[in-house]
UniProtKB/Swiss-Prot annotation:
This is Ferruginol synthase. The lineage of its organism: Eukaryota, Viridiplantae, Streptophyta, Embryophyta, Tracheophyta. Abietane diterpenoids (e.g. miltiradiene, abietatriene and ferruginol) accumulate specifically in the periderm of roots. The ent-kaurene diterpenoid oridonin, main constituent of Isodon rubescens, accumulates in leaves. The keyword Nucleotidyltransferase does not apply. Its cofactor is heme. It comes from Isodon rubescens. PANTHER family: CYTOCHROME P450, FAMILY 76, SUBFAMILY C, POLYPEPTIDE 5-RELATED, GERANIOL 8-HYDROXYLASE-LIKE. The gene is CYP76AH30. The chain crosses the membrane at residues 1-21.
Length: 492
C-alpha cells in the first residue's frame, strides 16, 4: 500500500509540475490548474460566461487547461485581430472534436481541413459560385416562396389566437430557405411528421458536435467512446449525408435524361457543374460534406439568431415599433420585403447587429489550433494549442460598448461597424481566412425573415412564459434561449 501511495504522490507531483511549467515558458496568465482535470470545474454550464469572468482577472489572452487540452482564450478585439489577421497562417488549424470524426467528416469537410489546395478550392466555390451576389439574387424567388409559407402559418395562428413557437417556426423556415437555395426543394412543412424527422437529424448533428465529450479533453479515452458520442454522431451524420446524396444523385440523373432542360437557380446545379467539368481536385464526398456543413451550420445558427432577434424586439416594444414603422415606410402594404430593399432599412440592420453583439450564435466561435510556436503580445502560444475567441465577452465589454447589457440598436446608426470580419469588436461569424462562408446567405435570411414577421403582425408574449428570464442561455453548438420563445401574432 505504501508503495502505491508513494507512486501516486509522485505521479501527481510530476503532473502538477507539467501543468504549471507553462508559467516558466512565459505562457499567457491564467487560473491555477488542478491535477488531471485542469480548470474544468471552473467552466460552469455556460463556459463563455465563465471565461468572461476569468478574463477580467487574467486579461484578454488567458491560459486554461481543459483536462490535458491546453487552451488560450481571446477576449479583446486587439488580441483577436493579432491572432486572426497578423498571425492568421500560424493559427489556421482546427481543433477537431471526436464527434467530427463521424463518417470521416474531419478528413473531408472544408470546416476542418487544413489550409491546402483542396481547402482553397472549396472556399473558392463558396465565394465565387454558391454565395456570389449573382447566385443569391437568382435564388431570391425561391426564398420568397418559403417566407410566404411562414406568413401563412403565422396568419393561421393569428386567426386562432395560438402562440407561435418562434424557435420551431424559425427552424422550419430556415431549413426550407436553405433547402430552396441549395436544392430547389422544400425540406419540411409546418406541423408535419417529416418536419419532426428532419429536425431530429439536424438538431442531432448540432447537439452531438456541441455536447461536452470527455474524450476531447482526455485523448486516452477516445478508443472507448464512453459517452457513445462517436456512435451517435455516425448515425446522425450518416442519415443526413444519405439525404444530401439522394438529392445529388437525382439531379445528376435528371440532367442525364434531360440535358436540354432549363437550369435551376440553386447550389446543387453548381455542384453538378463542378462534378461534370472536373475542374477541381475534389471528390463527390468533398461536395456532399460541404453541403452538410452549410446545412447544419446555417440551420442551427440562423434559427438561434432569429429567436433572439424576436425575443429582444418583443421585450423592447419601442424598438419593435421603430423597425415596423421603417419597414412600412419603405414597402407600404406589400407583405414580403424584397432583398434589394434591405439597404433602405438601416434601423432593421442596426437591430440585427445589436442582437448579434449581445447574442452571437456561437459565443466561442469554432476553435482554432496553433500550427507552430507563435509569440503573441509577448507571450508564447505553443504549437497544438487550442484557441477560443470569446465573441460573447467582446460584445459585452463595457470598455468598448456603452451600456453593453442594454438592447440599443441606435448605437449602430452613427457608426460603420459591421459583422463581416473587419471590425473585431463584432465577429459573430468569425474573421480571417476561416470566416463563415455562408455569411452572405445568413445575412439575407436574418433580415428577410425578421422583416416578414415584424411587418405583418403585432406580437405579444404568451402568458405562460411572460415572466421567464428572457436572457437565460442554454449552451451548445449555438447558444439558444433557455426558455423557448412563444409569442402570439396579432392583427396590426
Amino acid at each position: 500500500m505504501e508503495t502505491i501511495a508513494l507512486l501516486a504522490a509522485l505521479f501527481f507531483i510530476a503532473l502538477t509540475c507539467f501543468l504549471t511549467s507553462g508559467r516558466r515558458r512565459n505562457l499567457p496568465p491564467g487560473p491555477y490548474p488542478l491535477p488531471i482535470i485542469g480548470n474544468m470545474l471552473q467552466l460552469g454550464s455556460n463556459p463563455h460566461q465563465s471565461f468572461a469572468q476569468l478574463s477580467k482577472k487574467y486579461g484578454p489572452l488567458m491560459s486554461i487547461h481543459l483536462g490535458s487540452l491546453y487552451t488560450v482564450i481571446v477576449s479583446s478585439p486587439e488580441m483577436a485581430k493579432e491572432i486572426l489577421h497578423k498571425h492568421g497562417q500560424a493559427f489556421s488549424g482546427r481543433t477537431i472534436a471526436q464527434a467530427v470524426h463521424a463518417c470521416d467528416h474531419d478528413k473531408i469537410s472544408m470546416g476542418f481541413l487544413p489550409v491546402t489546395s483542396v481547402w482553397r478550392d472549396l472556399r473558392k466555390i463558396c465565394k465565387e459560385q454558391m454565395f456570389s451576389h449573382q447566385s443569391l439574387e437568382a435564388s431570391e424567388g425561391l426564398r420568397h416562396q418559403k417566407l410566404q409559407q411562414l406568413l401563412d402559418y403565422a396568419q393561421k395562428c393569428c386567426e386562432t389566437g395560438r402562440a407561435v413557437d418562434i424557435r420551431e417556426a424559425s427552424f422550419i423556415t430556415t431549413l426550407n430557405l436553405m433547402s430552396a437555395t441549395m436544392f430547389s426543394t422544400q425540406a419540411t412543412e409546418f406541423e408535419s411528421e417529416a418536419t419532426k424527422e428532419f429536425k431530429e437529424i439536424i438538431e442531432g448533428v448540432a447537439t452531438i458536435v456541441g455536447v461536452p465529450n470527455f474524450a476531447d479533453y482526455f485523448p486516452i479515452l477516445k478508443p472507448f467512446d464512453l459517452q457513445g458520442i462517436k456512435r451517435q454522431a455516425d448515425g446522425y451524420f450518416g442519415r443526413l449525408l444519405k439525404k444530401i446524396e439522394g438529392y445529388l444523385n437525382e439531379r445528376v440523373e435528371s440532367r442525364r435524361l434531360n440535358p436540354d432542360a432549363p437550369r435551376k437557380n440553386d447550389f446543387l446545379e453548381t455542384v453538378v457543374d463542378i462534378i461534370e467539368a472536373d475542374e477541381y481536385k475534389l471528390t463527390t464526398d468533398h461536395l456532399t460534406h460541404l453541403m452538410l456543413d452549410l446545412f447544419v451550420g446555417g440551420s442551427e445558427t440562423n434559427t438561434t439568431s432569429l429567436e433572439w432577434i424576436m425575443s429582444e424586439l418583443v421585450i423592447n416594444p419601442d424598438k419593435m415599433a421603430k423597425v415596423k414603422d421603417e419597414i412600412k415606410s419603405v414597402v407600404g402594404d406589400k407583405k414580403i420585403v424584397d432583398e434589394s430593399e434591405m439597404p433602405r432599412l438601416p434601423y432593421l440592420q442596426a437591430a440585427i447587429k445589436e442582437v448579434l453583439r449581445i447574442h452571437p450564435p456561437g459565443p466561442l466561435l469554432l476553435p482554432r489550433r496553433a500550427e507552430i510556436d507563435q509569440e503573441v503580445n509577448g507571450y508564447l502560444i505553443p504549437k497544438g494549442t487550442q484557441i477560443l475567441f470569446n465573441a460573447w465577452a467582446i460584445g459585452r465589454d463595457p470598455s468598448i460598448w456603452k451600456n453593453p447589457e442594454s438592447f440599443e440598436p441606435e448605437r449602430f446608426l452613427d457608426q460603420t461597424v459591421d459583422f463581416k470580419g473587419q471590425d473585431f469588436e463584432l465577429i459573430p461569424f468569425g474573421s480571417g481566412r476561416r470566416i463563415c462562408p455562408g455569411m452572405p446567405l445568413a445575412n439575407r435570411i436574418l433580415h428577410m425573415t425578421t422583416a416578414t414577421l415584424v411587418h405583418n403582425f403585432d406580437w405579444k408574449l404568451e402568458e405562460e412564459t411572460a415572466n421567464a428570464d428572457h436572457q437565460d442561455e442554454l449552451f451548445g453548438l449555438a447558444v439558444r434561449r433557455a426558455v423557448p420563445l412563444k409569442i402570439i401574432p396579432l392583427r396590426p
